[in-house]
């Protein structure tokens, strides 16, 4: 086992604090509308330019192992906030640095670290209660756009685009962000249920120009197994022909004689039909077929459920206003499923999302949820160069996460005002134990850190801004760093999601509390290089 290097108390905290400061100072320059960019070297290709706090934090690795431990713990703050709220990573880092700094001073002055941590926790709980009380629900699409704009560093076009996408696909809908090949940033919205399986034969095409099969007011047969022959299906096929409506068959596969018969019928004009493979694999395929059955108001034909193909009637088939199938995708628009059934299924999938521990499963469940509940929107980010596209994509993703968080827990005044106003709630707290009270006071001071940093990044003295805001009685009065003006933050549209502010403070105080209570640090001792070998002796050349 390699030898270890151990540092204690003051020495350990000093090294750790140095690491915290290096990482936090690199991250905090990005805070606010006038935050600066950070350029990150890449081992290949052009460097990356970003204003995303967590991206900067993830790139920092320090040479000194003890300093690096401090930096990595603050990096964890940014990562955790990003995972939970998707934004607010820089605010969380600034708060963590402020709490650790003040905490380290208090410990150096001889206070009990455990009591300090208790005080920090009491104060944070009071702030969170205050934020929850102040949060107001997002009422309109324009408020969604404002949240997006603030998170995208004042880019109103991005805010507007996210609001448009959310309006179309609903709050449960899936919005993905991709890179665009052109200069423009655009939104592409898919209404209805879309899955990545196309027609099994090009002979099913009805629109030769677009190479798509478009079937209006269609019946949908959902079959769990492969279809090799159509003998068992004849009764239901005849009933569909008599109704004069088209039929879409979705099964594990349609092959051989079955596919040939369907193609011949389609070409002769006897039956408007198209066949598609079922989406997904294994258990997921079955679940997606059940989703389709609920969405279209039909039944999944499965022998497990005791339904045989020969017993299928037209009533068991699903219905949809329109089905569009191209070479690679199928879209079902306006399925005839009953709303209560769809809502029950959505509730079931939400419960599964909460229970699952696998990120992959969660992602797939969220996709299913979106397809059932709303739709899918894709924001394609464009730009003149690859570097610009990547930087813009970071901002779009931040803005998207912030708007989702706002819809969940409501909004509070932005620009660090919500935390600053929470000082009143913390100021009321008193504790007989002086060290616990000192912990409460640490949070009281740290609540000013984000607004000070936003002001300083805009070239304005932070303490003057804090003083001026606290003098004003209005709860929503704050500093608009973009225009260097004092305004009503909510009226001006400078708002933050309550969830982002709450998560940033919780994560920052959690890690900062651990750093403050650290008394020893253990790292691998640096290896001493072995002395170089003796050079070979001079020979007796030739003898």
Swiss-Prot record:
A GO BP annotation: chaperone cofactor-dependent protein refolding
Residue sites binding ATP per the record: 30-33, 51, 87-91, 415, 496
UniProt-listed Pfam families: Cpn60_TCP1
Domain of life the protein comes from: Bacteria
Keywords recorded for this protein, A-Z: ATP-binding, Chaperone, Cytoplasm, Isomerase, Nucleotide-binding
Catalyzed chemical reaction(s): ATP + H2O + a folded polypeptide = ADP + phosphate + an unfolded polypeptide
Localization in the cell: Cytoplasm
GO cellular component, one term: GroEL-GroES complex
Assigned EC number: 5.6.1.7
GO-annotated molecular function: ATP binding; ATP-dependent protein folding chaperone; isomerase activity; unfolded protein binding
Statement: the UniProt record of this protein carries the keyword Cell inner membrane: no
Family membership noted in the UniProt record: Belongs to the chaperonin (HSP60) family.
Quaternary structure and interacting proteins, as annotated: Forms a cylinder of 14 subunits composed of two heptameric rings stacked back-to-back. Interacts with the co-chaperonin GroES.
Main function: Together with its co-chaperonin GroES, plays an essential role in assisting protein folding. The GroEL-GroES system forms a nano-cage that allows encapsulation of the non-native substrate proteins and provides a physical environment optimized to promote and accelerate protein folding.
Protein name: Chaperonin GroEL 7
């Amino acid at each position: 086992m390699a030898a270890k290097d151990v540092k204690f108390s003051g020495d350990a905290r000093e090294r750790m604090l140095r690491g915290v400061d290096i990482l936090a100072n690199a991250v905090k320059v990005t805070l606010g509308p006038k935050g600066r960019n950070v350029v990150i070297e890449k081992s290949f290709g052009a460097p990356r330019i970003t204003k995303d706090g967590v991206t900067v934090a993830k790139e920092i690795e320090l040479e000194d192992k003890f300093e690096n431990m401090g930096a990595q713990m603050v990096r964890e703050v940014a990562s955790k906030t990003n995972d939970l709220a998707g934004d607010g990573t820089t605010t969380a880092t600034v708060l963590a640095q402020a709490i650790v700094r003040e905490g380290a001073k208090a410990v150096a002055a001889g206070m009990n670290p455990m009591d300090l941590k208790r005080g920090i926790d009491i104060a944070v709980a009071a702030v969170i209660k205050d934020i929850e009380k102040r949060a107001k629900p997002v009422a309109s699409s324009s408020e969604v756009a404002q949240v997006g704009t603030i998170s995208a560093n004042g880019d109103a076009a991005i805010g507007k685009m996210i609001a448009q996408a959310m309006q179309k696909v609903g709050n449960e809908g899936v919005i993905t962000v991709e890179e665009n090949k052109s200069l423009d940033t655009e939104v592409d919205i898919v209404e209805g249920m879309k899955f990545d399986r196309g027609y099994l034969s090009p002979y099913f095409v009805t629109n030769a120009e677009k190479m798509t099969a478009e079937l209006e007011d269609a019946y949908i047969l959902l079959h769990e197994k492969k279809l090799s022959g159509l003998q068992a299906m004849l009764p239901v096929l005849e009933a569909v022909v008599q109704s004069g409506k088209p039929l879409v068959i979705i099964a594990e596969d349609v092959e051989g004689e079955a596919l040939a018969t369907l193609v011949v019928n389609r070409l002769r004009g006897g039956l408007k039909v198209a066949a598609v493979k079922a989406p997904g694999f294994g258990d997921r395929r079955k679940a997606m077929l059940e989703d389709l059955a609920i969405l279209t108001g039909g039944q999944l034909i499965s022998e497990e459920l005791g339904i045989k193909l020969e017993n299928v009637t037209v009533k068991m088939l699903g219905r949809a206003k329109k089905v569009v199938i191209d070479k690679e995708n199928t879209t079902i628009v306006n399925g005839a499923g009953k709303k209560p059934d769809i809502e029950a299924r959505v509730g079931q999938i939400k419960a599964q999302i909460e229970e699952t521990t696998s990120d992959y499963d969660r992602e797939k469940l969220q996709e299913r949820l979106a397809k059932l509940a709303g739709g899918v929107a894709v924001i394609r980010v464009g730009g003149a160069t690859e570097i610009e596209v990547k930087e813009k994509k970071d901002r779009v993703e931040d803005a998207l996460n912030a708007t989702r968080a706002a819809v969940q827990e409501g909004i509070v005044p932005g620009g660090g005002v919500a935390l600053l106003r929470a000082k009143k709630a913390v100021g009321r707290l008193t504790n007989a134990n002086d060290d616990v009270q000192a912990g409460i006071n640490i949070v009281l001071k740290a609540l000013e850190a984000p607004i000070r940093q936003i002001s300083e990044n805009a070239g304005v003295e932070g303490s003057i801004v804090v003083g001026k805001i606290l003098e004003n009685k209005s709860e929503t009065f704050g500093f608009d760093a973009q225009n260097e003006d004092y305004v009503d933050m909510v009226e001006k549209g400078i708002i933050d999601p309550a969830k982002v502010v709450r998560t940033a403070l919780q994560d920052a105080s959690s890690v900062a509390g651990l750093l403050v209570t650290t008394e020893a640090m253990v790292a691998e001792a640096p290896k001493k290089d072995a002395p170089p070998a003796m050079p070979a002796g001079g020979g007796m050349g030739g003898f």
